[in-house]
A protein has these predicted regions:
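Beta-strand/loop-rich accessory regions of lumenal/periplasmic or secreted enzymes
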Residues: 1-196
Length: 196
């Protein structure tokens, strides 16, 4: 079945090359749609943009219902360090409560992401689809998932918690779920150069 919602995207570019991205989702109130996993954007960037510098929760991966053991701080990491080889391939590497995120090459050139409110982000050399094989799970292991030839970045207003608070299959607690409805998210992408 098709998703019953409208998504409006607005891109505003200033004279310095910064792009303000605003996405607004208007849900069909009559639709019966399950909870959403995330609300945000995904982009494929050149694989050479493999350096991460951000101010948010870290240094380990953390999610809305699993971030109380992480500290707010300024962290420098690589894209390779974001992937955790769980026994079964799955979502990994997300950071929460981010104030700003820089995705650059080793020379310091790339993009900076900022928003008016804290956001979540991740950067992996894997597509989301390669880490989640859908409802019917295959017998495979993380080390068998091939790397993509790009850096896959997700920048999210909100992402559902992991759940599993009383068993492996438990849904997240109510406050960490993303119910189908209207959402709006804006962020700014700014080009950064090491010589500026």
């Amino acid at each position: 079945d098709a998703v019953k919602a409208k998504l409006y995207l607005t891109y505003t570019i200033n004279n310095e090359g910064a792009v303000k991205v605003t996405q607004k989702m208007v849900a069909d109130k009559s639709a019966e749609v399950s909870d959403m996993f995330r609300f945000g954007m995904q982009m494929q960037m050149p694989k050479c943009l493999d350096q991460i510098n951000y101010y948010g929760r870290g240094p380990i991966e953390n999610y809305s219902d699993r971030n109380n053991v992480t500290d707010l701080g300024n962290y420098r990491q690589t894209v390779d360090e974001q992937f955790y080889s769980y026994i079964r391939p799955q979502e990994t590497g997300t950071k929460t409560d981010i104030r700003w995120w820089k995705q650059t090459n080793k020379g310091g050139n790339g993009l900076m992401f900022i928003s008016e409110a804290p956001f979540s982000a991740s950067a992996l050399n894997y597509s989301i689809e390669s880490l989640d094989d859908g409802v019917q799970k295959d017998q495979r292991h993380s080390e068998l998932v091939p790397q993509a030839n790009y850096t896959n970045m997700c920048i999210d207003k909100v992402q559902m918690g992991l759940g599993c608070v009383n068993s492996w299959g438990a849904l997240p607690l109510e406050q960490y779920r993303i119910h189908y409805g209207d959402y709006e998210f804006s962020f700014i992408m700014k080009p950064i150069q090491s010589n500026l």
